């Protein structure tokens, strides 16, 4: 069964290099496409989903923005499993200050290059292994600042209230982007941060193996 991976906002398929699938499941990494001006997240998800073969069962795995994107795709196509990691499936699990930021349109005040710079600074201070940190910083450097700014705006304007069927939600108790206290995950990683697929991938892989066992 094909398993489609969707990365976070300033990343690509390399972010999943530590994630392993059991026999019978094939990893396919969906690359981001260029958004249209002020395109809604729901419309973008429809266009991204054109890369998915929907004539056969498939699994979706998304991290951060990728988890939100995977949620939108799952709502339309109802795959056997939707797995989001360090993400949220509905607006009610976002912190209230996201809505304040959207109402004040704070995303308009800063250029995409500033978001990109802040992402780099954050990862200089995190606990990834040196090789992982090097790859992450390279991915951030290669990301179009305009895409980062679009992604932030799209998330702040997202309003989904429906929980998809077959949702599996992995979340760390120290997630600094989507605080744990607002979420309702199916699987919790104690003291896990937002970058679980890099900092706690051993535990993520164990959880994934348990989930995939139910799909065989």
Where are each of the predicted segments found?
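Active-site signature of alpha/beta-hydrolase-fold catalytic machinery across serine-
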Residues: 18, 72-76
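Gly/Ala-rich beta-loop-alpha elbow adjacent to hydrolase catalytic centers
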Residues: 61-70
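Flexible "cap/lid" loop of the alpha/beta hydrolase fold
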Residues: 78-112
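Short beta-strand/loop motif that positions the catalytic acidic residue
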Residues: 169-171, 175
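Conserved alpha/beta-hydrolase catalytic His-Asp/Glu region
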Residues: 113-160
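Catalytic histidine-centered segment of alpha/beta-hydrolase-like enzymes
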Residues: 38-39, 192-207
